[in-house]
């Protein structure tokens, strides 16, 4: 990594309460213990539990839980505004990890957008665009993807 990344900073991980997002959060705290880690999750209760697990594993105290529901573009906008005014160190990493797969009936969020598309794609697209002004030089944005929308897999997505 370049030396610019070694200064204090903030990493934001969406869906950091379980799975790949949690593993990513663990690794970030291991490699950059001086950074502030933002767990951006839909469920505050689950995010607080994840933060407690990270802290009990020696991750340090600079872990922040923030509410983010990617199914709601209003929630994404609120989150971006909160990041801008929170007084966090410069954002050096944004990991867009949160995602869902609904195999049952097709569902829609506000505005008539299919739920998995809203959460897995549009929410993260808006989030990344809104946070561009808050990113430090040499910051990284990582998008985690899946085969959820692969039409050959017939997973229930229209």
PLM features: what roles do these ranges have?
Residues 2-158:
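Rossmann-fold NAD(P)H-dependent dehydrogenase/reductase core
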């Amino acid at each position: 990594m370049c030396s610019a990344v070694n200064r204090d900073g903030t990493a934001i991980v969406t869906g950091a309460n379980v799975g790949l997002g949690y593993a990513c959060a663990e690794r970030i705290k291991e490699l950059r213990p001086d950074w502030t880690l933002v767990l951006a999750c839909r469920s505050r209760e689950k995010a607080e539990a994840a933060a407690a697990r990270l802290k009990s594993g020696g991750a340090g105290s600079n872990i922040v839980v923030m509410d983010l529901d990617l199914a709601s573009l209003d929630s994404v906008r609120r989150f971006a505004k909160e990041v801008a005014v929170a007084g966090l160190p410069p954002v050096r990493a944004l990991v867009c990890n949160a995602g869902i797969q609904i195999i049952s009936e097709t569902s829609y969020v506000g505005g008539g957008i299919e739920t998995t598309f809203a959460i897995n794609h549009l929410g993260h697209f808006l989030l990344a665009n809104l946070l561009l002004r808050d990113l430090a030089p040499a910051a990284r944005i990582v998008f985690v993807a899946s085969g959820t929308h692969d039409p050959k897999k017939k997973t229930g997505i229209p």
